[in-house]
């Protein structure tokens, strides 16, 4: 339980730092958006996040459909805070980022 609480606290801290350090949204440029937000956790699969490019890890999530994936980002899931680390992203941005992360790199 302590580990989970610490992980969530660390994620919230990272989310706040990302908003201060990288407030710019890179609309239409998923790799740049990813580097400024999602990559903090998804680059290596921190706290249960499926790693970018790991198609097998993303497969069960993608079976739920893109709308469900976007809702998970918007509302938060597990250690991921609502909005991920891109609170200024639109649903279309989230969908592009999910597509980018869930495909082989």
State where each predicted segment sits.
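Axial heme c-ligation environment in periplasmic c-type cytochrome domains
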Residues: 51, 69-95, 101-104
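The canonical Cys-X-X-Cys-His
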Residues: 37-44, 97
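Flanking scaffold residues of small Cys/His-coordinated metal-binding clusters
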Residues: 33
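Gly/Gly-Pro-rich "capping" loops immediately C-terminal to redox-active cysteine motifs
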Residues: 42-71
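Bacterial N-terminal signal peptides that target proteins for export
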Residues: 2-15
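N-terminal signal peptide c-region/cleavage motif recognized by signal peptidases
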Residues: 22-24
